[in-house]
From Swiss-Prot:
One of its GO terms (molecular function) is tRNA (guanine(46)-N7)-methyltransferase activity. The active site is at residue 145. This is tRNA (guanine-N(7)-)-methyltransferase. It is an enzyme of class 2 (transferase). Its EC number is 2.1.1.33. HAMAP family: tRNA_methyltr_TrmB. SUPFAM superfamilies: S-adenosyl-L-methionine-dependent methyltransferases (SSF53335). The keyword S-adenosyl-L-methionine applies. The lineage of its organism: Bacteria, Pseudomonadati, Pseudomonadota, Betaproteobacteria, Neisseriales.
């Protein structure tokens, strides 16, 4: 692989492809009283409101520790556990779904975690407008919606245009860690990441699950049913 400019994209990147990318799909979900209370009482301490201008993450966290972006955290259990396991790393966790946001805030409070900040916004807009180039040491995207039906594959988050937006935000030596339990999506992820000359796979293909990523209940249930899980860890080399 060779070093390339930060805005390097694969040859097949669609021209003008930008605003069609979305990091989420709206769905109906019930907010419990405890989740709403967490948002009401903890947001000022651990929440970050969206702004359309670059943010100083060190100032927002009050530290110069390494910064990891997590896109889509579900109910937040894995996010809280990773932050507990890596106390010398800061995590910016982004999701749009209220119950998950409330639950993660609740877990942050219960576990006395000081190294997570939460955003409730479209991660694509955060990446485009709020994150400074070279501000991230890593990016986690675990179990994004696989959109099983072929006609819906265009809705998948892990596609070349989105990775092209993420790459400039990573420091050289920073990493992207993806995980999925859908084999065909894992193959697509591998193809997409491998198409960037300034990303280097840390494994021959799929990586062993890093120690910091806990097994989720959903993941454990899938394994009992014979389903696989695939992790991919690529490092930025230029």
């Amino acid at each position: 692989m060779t070093d390339t400019p930060e805005n390097q994209t694969p040859n097949d990147l669609p021209a003008g492809h930008s605003r069609s990318i979305r990091s989420f799909v709206l769905r109906q979900s019930h907010m419990t009283a405890a989740q709403q209370r967490a948002i009401d009482t903890l947001w000022d301490s651990f929440g970050i409101d969206y702004q359309a201008t670059p943010a100083d993450l060190d100032a927002r966290f009050g530290s110069s520790r390494p910064k990891i972006l997590e896109i889509g955290f579900g109910m937040g259990m894995a996010s809280a556990e990773i932050a507990r396991r890596l106390p010398e790393t800061d995590f910016l966790a982004i999701d749009v779904h209220g119950p998950g946001v409330g639950n993660l805030l609740k877990l942050i409070n219960e576990n006395h975690l000081e190294n997570i900040r939460v955003m409730r916004h479209d991660a694509v807009e955060v990446v485009e407008n709020m994150l400074q180039d070279g501000s991230l040491d890593g990016i986690h995207i675990f179990f994004p919606d696989p959109w099983h039906k072929k006609r819906h594959h265009k809705r998948r988050l892990i596609q070349a245009p989105f990775i092209a937006k993420l790459l400039p935000k990573l420091k050289t030596g920073g990493y992207i860690h993806l995980a999925t339990d859908w084999e065909e999506y894992a193959q697509q992820m591998l193809e997409v990441l491998s198409s960037f000359d300034n990303l280097q796979n840390t494994a021959a293909d799929y990586a062993p699950t890093p120690d910091y990523r806990p097994e989720t209940k959903f993941e454990a249930r899938g394994k009992r049913l014979g389903h696989g899980v695939w992790d991919l860890v690529f490092k930025r080399i230029g």
